């Protein structure tokens, strides 16, 4: 057994450290115990790996040996009603293929036109709050129809999705205790509220005789074999999981891209000048810097894990774990600061030399790769490009730091990042 396993006091200290600052906690344990160690916390045994060989081994397990899906579900189910997962027919992998993503581009542009009109000619906003609303508009406009991106429906849907937000289990782990204590009554109420709004959008489209071959229509076709009332419910629940999956990282990644540009005059000038591919590289670099994802594999059958020094037999029930924020900024020289030159397209540049590629991640590796990667990057690039074309910005902040308590997903900001804007026309 690697070092770190302990008794009740050790488990209590681990839980406290993880809640206060997960990244700093894992980094301290790594310095004290080495590249492979055990943490017992919150009823789980975590086998933590940070060596090149150990992290590569984590990503190499087959799903039936050590499950990524079950490990993630184990965290999300604490926040989301269990009946939301039953009967799903349309998954992110189904909807985010290369050809499918191209269908979203027009919807993203339409959603941005609505958002720019809502912002008006001048004002100010907090970047992460605005990005959250914008992320909802971009996502819902893409798979719930352009109607959902309108202010009429968006102002009803946003608070419902925010209440149901499964990423809260990662961003603010302590709040999950309240969800458990209340039996998820507020989350279930939000789920039913979204079901009613989606049914209303579809009914309005049908009563107006409108035929539109978008993803909302595709979702409804996939449930053609069930009664209309139940069909509305099942379509809405597919849509909820798809939207929640994209929003867990999209809006924070969008916010950090804009924040990093506002803090770097040189890169901002190059983006405004239209340097080819630069905005995409800024998005990937912003995600790399802000990643707080904890990668988990729940062991289902005994597996052998090689960390480069020795091989461990890992029993079922153990979570094999690494945390991206520990390695993303330390795996090679220069990765501790923002520089879009670290990327060529969606891959790290040849100048970034790593012991293994898995030590740095934005959207995951192998079966961990986020299916919404192309959609998310397209959404970020379109949104930031349209905002910069329309407005001049003045940052009312001089620094931005990731939220220290976050475990999972792309970080939210520790402090508000307020900007003033004025139309360029």
Feature-to-residue mapping (PLM):
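Conserved cytochrome P450 K-helix/beta-meander segment immediately N-terminal to the heme-binding cysteine loop
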Residues: 322-351
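Cytochrome P450 heme-thiolate "Cys pocket" and heme-binding signature region
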Residues: 345-385, 390-396, 403-410
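Cytochrome P450 catalytic-core helices
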Residues: 238, 247-272, 371-391
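N-terminal membrane-proximal hinge/A-helix region immediately C-terminal to the signal-anchor transmembrane segment
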Residues: 1-75, 359
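Cytochrome P450 catalytic core segment centered on helix I
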Residues: 160-228, 324
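Conserved cytochrome P450 K-helix E-x-x-R motif and the immediately C-terminal K′/meander segment
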Residues: 15-28, 275-312
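Cytochrome P450
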Residues: 41-45, 48, 52, 71-112, 119-141, 148-152, ...
